[in-house]
Amino acid sequence: MNMELNNSVFLIYWSLLECKFSIFVLNFWNRWKHILLYKFSSPISIYNHLSSRSKNRISSREYFFNMNIRDPILNTYFYLSFLFERIGLKKDEDVGKLKRNRIFDIFDERSKENRLVYAVKYMSKKSNNREKMNRRLAWIETTLNDLRICKKYFYNFPFSVEIKDRLDEELSISKSIELTVPTTIAYESINIVPRSITRTLSRFKAELIGQSSSLVLHEFKLAKYQALASLRYMGCLLFLPFFISSISKKWVLEPRIKDWWNTSQFQIFINHLQEKKALKRLQDVEELLWLDRIILEEDHSKDLSIKIREKTVQLVAIYNEDSIQIILNLLTDIISFTILSVLVIIGKKRLAVSNSWIQELFHSLSDTMKAFFILLLTDLFIGFHSPHGWEIIIGSILEHIGFAYDKYTISYFVSTFPVILDTVFKYWIFRHLNRLSPSIVATYHTMNE
């Protein structure tokens, strides 16, 4: 972990150095480029002070390739003349016949002032951009310095050995490390010396050295980051699949499913349960209409058949809409399950952080509260009254996805699944909880009796 952290910090420092060096070179070049363009923007003043031999030498393009490097004035003049000719002037067939007056007329006083104003605006704009970039680079450098200081204090504390062991144990779950999320694990493995003794000695040593305040501050920040990351991740797991599936159901799936079902499908019911319900409701409607006819003592058989037909059409429309909703529920459940699976697979490290945070909360409770919550969960799922709750839950799920309600299947599920849960829970108590905290097990058995 230390090696990967040091490598990452080194890469960030190296990138920061390269960026600063590049900005320095660009600033130097931009500053001197505008100065040279302004200083030598009128090469006629240089040309008038040249000798006839030099004038004849610079009139040819070959001088650019054979110029004397020791003659800086001639070099500057020819370079600027050649540059302005390439970017602003048209080429003639004969370079020797090019009139210098066309070149020199460009560099009058007005163009000189305009170029000066443009250069000042350009440099002020670039300076603002450089100031923003320098502020960002300074922020990055300050963050790296804070990271180095925190790392120094963290690894110098005697009690930080326990926290480092937690980090190493949790980060061994994955191959890579997320530096943005501080991760810890809630408990350590069982050693020969009880960890309560080592923890007390470490805290006593920290009090003697005078590092307790910094240690408490660091643990508080670590717990804060862990809690925020866990709550954020659990919020995504709970609300993001529901939010995406609801939007896709309303705006994407529902119009297409309705069009497909009403145009391509000729059936109304998906299963026999809907047919039985529709037939039962139709019989009830007919009985009510016949009862009204008998009470009123009127013979309107034609009106009665029309009313029965209207009620039948209404029932057909109702159960047709129910069939569409069943298909939509099935598709949205598949979308929600897919999104939830993707979030769990992508956020394995955040899931480990959430797991450690939940375990930390659980272990921070007293033994009585731990036993109370264990009893509450066990009685809720595998207790005496749990079969009725399981029947309601399974029936609602079957109705939601469009399956027929079968009491024999539900009874078989209720008679087997809670037994499996009870076996798994007892194994967890025997295997894990009994070693972790025997006092919780004793309190649990006492309250259960």
Curated annotation (Swiss-Prot):
The gene is cemA. It catalyses: K(+)(in) + H(+)(out) = K(+)(out) + H(+)(in). One of its GO terms (molecular function) is proton transmembrane transporter activity. Keywords: Antiport, Chloroplast, Hydrogen ion transport, Ion transport, Membrane, Plastid, Plastid inner membrane, Potassium, Potassium transport, Transmembrane, Transmembrane helix, Transport. One of its GO terms (biological process) is potassium ion transport. Pfam families: CemA. It is found in: Plastid, Chloroplast inner membrane. This is Potassium/proton antiporter CemA. It is a multi-pass membrane protein. Contributes to K(+)/H(+) antiport activity by supporting proton efflux to control proton extrusion and homeostasis in chloroplasts in a light-dependent manner to modulate photosynthesis. Prevents excessive induction of non-photochemical quenching (NPQ) under continuous-light conditions. Indirectly promotes efficient inorganic carbon uptake into chloroplasts. It comes from Psilotum nudum (Whisk fern).
